[in-house]
Amino acid sequence: MSNAVATPVGPKSSGADARVSVPLLAELLTAEDRRRRVWADLGGAQGGLTANLSGKPGHLLVADLPRALLDGQAQWYLPDSILPGRFWREPVDRFLCWDLLNYMNGNELGALSSCLARHGANDCRVHALIQYSGKQMSEYPARFTLDGDLRLTVDETGPAGRQTPRYSPKALEKAMPDLRVERTLLLNNGMQEFLFGLR
């Protein structure tokens, strides 16, 4: 497992204008790969991701787990409880979790791990952003917008009011036994970028 530091674009900011490079996600999106790929975005729909995947073979599923959390759904953390079974007929090659893992407890992380393993292709990769600094985070998951330069704009959904779990790589592997941490990258906006593979 490798660990490095990436530099944000422009001045530091905790508001809607915070833009940050996400090298591990950029690698997934720019990989020279002519294979048909199925992507599953566990966040809300956003045009930037669709634009970056445009022209590539495959398709994109959007589960919108943040909306399920806001709506109070009991199993909001399970994408196959949000999208009916017909959406999961093909194995998924890439799962995008954004900051959602920060909002799950150990049991929920374990259930998500099983779900991703059940629907993932053999060479599946799972991307996530984990808060590693600060004691408080926004009450609900942030909104992310990916621009043409493969940088993220992070739009917090409200004031900080929730304790930050600050999951370590070892803690995540323990809670998510179906996944293994392959690479991590510290981002200077207080997040750590993670790339997981299936065990």
Give short role names for the model-derived ranges:
Residues 99, 108, 120, 130-132:
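Generic secondary-structure microfeatures
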Residues 90-110:
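A short SAM/SAH-binding and catalytic strip from SAM-dependent methyltransferases
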Residues 44-45, 108:
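Short, glycine/acidic-rich beta->alpha junctions
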Residues 43-44, 100:
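Conserved residues at beta->alpha junctions
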Residues 110-125:
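A short glycine-rich, Lys/Arg-flanked "PGG" loop and its adjoining helix->strand segment in the class I
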